[in-house]
A protein has these predicted regions:
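Catalytic-domain carbohydrate-binding cleft regions of carbohydrate-active enzymes
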Residues: 1-245
C-alpha cells in the first residue's frame, strides 16, 4: 500500500515530523481493493476476492452513488492464510515507514445491496455463511500476527469497527460504528459499551459527537459545528468519551 495521492507527496517527512513532536500516527486501512490496485490484481489471480458489492459502490465522488459507474471494489478473503500474507506484504511498506497504529475500517465488512445468495460463496474455511461473523477477527489477527512476527519491540495498536469473541487477545480497540448524532444515540452508547465489555474486552469507544450529523446542518453544508444544539451534544459526548479507552 502506497501514498499515491499528490497531497501526500512527502509522506515520509510527515510521519517523521509527527514522531519528532513525540506523537504517534495512525492510518485508515480497508479490507477491500479497487481493480486498478496491485493487491486486487494479485488476490484476484489467486481467487481470493469475494464477489459482492462493497463500499464504495461508485467510482465517482458523488452522492448518492452512481450505480452506472461501478467502482469494482471487492473484499478480500481473510480466512485464507495466503490472502492474509498478501495483505501484509503490501501493508508492511507502511509499517516500515513508521506508521504506529492501524485504523481498520470496514471489518464487518461493508456489504451493499445484500442478497442472501451472496453468503453461499465459498471461502478458505468453507461456507462463507457459516463463518461470516468471524470476518473481523480474521482481519485483525492477520495484521496483529504479521506485525508481531517482524517487530516484537513495538506494541501493535489496532482500532477496528467490528469484533468477534476471542479478538481481545490482539488487544484491539473497537468502536460502535457509524452512528447518528443525537441524544438518543448518545444514551444508547452506554449500554452498548457495557454489554461489549461482557465479552472480556474493555477496550470499546464511540464516535464522539456521532457520525451522521446532517440534521444539525440547518444553515448549509457543515454548518452543524456552529449549531449550539450540536455543540451541547458534542460537549456531553466528549465527557462520556473521556471514560472510554
Amino acid at each position: 500500500m502506497e501514498f499515491l495521492n499528490e497531497d501526500f507527496g512527502r509522506a515520509q517527512d510527515m510521519i517523521d515530523e509527527v514522531h519528532r513532536r513525540n506523537a504517534h500516527i495512525s492510518i485508515s486501512i480497508w479490507q477491500s481493493f479497487g481493480p486498478h490496485t496491485k493487491p486486487y490484481r494479485e488476490l484476484k489471480e489467486k481467487g481470493l476476492l469475494f464477489d459482492y458489492e462493497t463500499w464504495p459502490q461508485s467510482g465517482l465522488p458523488t452522492w448518492p452513488p452512481r450505480k452506472d459507474y461501478p467502482s469494482g471494489v471487492r473484499v478480500y478473503d481473510p480466512y485464507s492464510k495466503e490472502a492474509r500474507d498478501i495483505y501484509w506484504k503490501y501493508l508492511s511498506n507502511l509499517h516500515k515507514m513508521g506508521i504506529d497504529a492501524w485504523w481498520m475500517d470496514s471489518t464487518d465488512p461493508d456489504h451493499m445491496d445484500f442478497k442472501d445468495s451472496d453468503l453461499d460463496q465459498n471461502c478458505a474455511m468453507g461456507s462463507y455463511r457459516s463463518v461470516r461473523n468471524l470476518f473481523p477477527m480474521m482481519c485483525v489477527e492477520g495484521v496483529y500476527d504479521h506485525q508481531r512476527a517482524v517487530d516484537t519491540d513495538k506494541r501493535v495498536f489496532i482500532l477496528t469497527r467490528s469484533y468477534f469473541a476471542g479478538q481481545q487477545r490482539t488487544g484491539a480497540n473497537t468502536w460502535s460504528g457509524d452512528i447518528p448524532s443525537s441524544w438518543e444515540s448518545l444514551r444508547k452508547q452506554v449500554p452498548i459499551c457495557l454489554n461489549y465489555t461482557l465479552t472480556a474486552n474493555p477496550q470499546v469507544n464511540t464516535d464522539i459527537g456521532g457520525f451522521f450529523s446532517n440534521s444539525y446542518n440547518t444553515q448549509g453544508r457543515q454548518s452543524g459545528v456552529r449549531n449550539p444544539q450540536y455543540q451541547e451534544l458534542y460537549v456531553r459526548w466528549m465527557q462520556f468519551g473521556a471514560f472510554c479507552p
